[in-house]
Amino acid sequence: MSNDVKIGRQFLIDEFGVRSETIERFEHYHSLVLKWQPAQNLVSRETLAHFWVRHICDSSTLIKLNGPKGIWLDFGSGAGFPGLVTAILHKQLNADGPSSVVHLVESNKRKVAFLRTVIRETGINAVVHASRIEKFVENSDIKPDFISARAVTALKNLQVFSEDYVSKGSACFFHKGRDINGEIAEAANIFDFDLVKHIQALPGNRQSDGVIAEIGTIRRKTS
């Protein structure tokens, strides 16, 4: 077992009290990433060796902020961060059902197939929507409690996708880089919004690459 796996497993046990079956789901998720990686390039080569800390632990921060509850909408899910991690933790921490589900929006057909494989083989409560984000937003009647995104697009674009949901009570939690101030300034040309930056701390004395931007209100500016 690599040091990354040991640190990641212990973090999940310490922070969430996860049981063996949840660890096994994460292990199976990891094995599927390794299996699909050569053809799909699901994660960068630089972070693959630190999968548990850089991706699983990093994504789990959302549960620490909000608890295992509610309907989640994850934009541009890619390899499943943070959406699949959220759903795997929900499986144990909250009896998953209609009130606790993660909706993953992804347009890449191969990544859609990967996400559906993980969901099927781990038995988690998540749904994949094979769509571009803008098309999904136009046509969906889902009413999420929380919206997430990680390494997808600029903050201003995420706010465009999210503004109608937020007006109905949704809260946004976007993983962004530590250089987020430039994106905030750019978004402020279009929207008035309330934003809280949560600094992420990763286990094993690793420095996180970013912050989580929590947004509770989005109001489009009028000229």
What are these regions (language model features)?
Residues 60-149, 159:
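Conserved SAM/SAH cofactor-binding pocket of Class I
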Residues 101, 125-127, 171, 192-195:
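Conserved beta-strand segments of alpha/beta enzyme cores
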Residues 103, 177-223:
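Active-site capping/gating segments
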Residues 78, 151-154, 178:
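Short glycine-rich anion-binding loops that position phosphate/pyrophosphate groups of nucleotides
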Residues 159-171:
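A short glycine-rich, Lys/Arg-flanked "PGG" loop and its adjoining helix->strand segment in the class I
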Residues 37, 90, 119, 188-191:
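Conserved hydrophobic residues forming the short capping helix/wall of the S-adenosyl-L-methionine
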Residues 33, 86, 176:
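Residue-level signal for inorganic ion chemistry
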Residues 1-69, 110-125:
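Class I SAM-dependent transferase core
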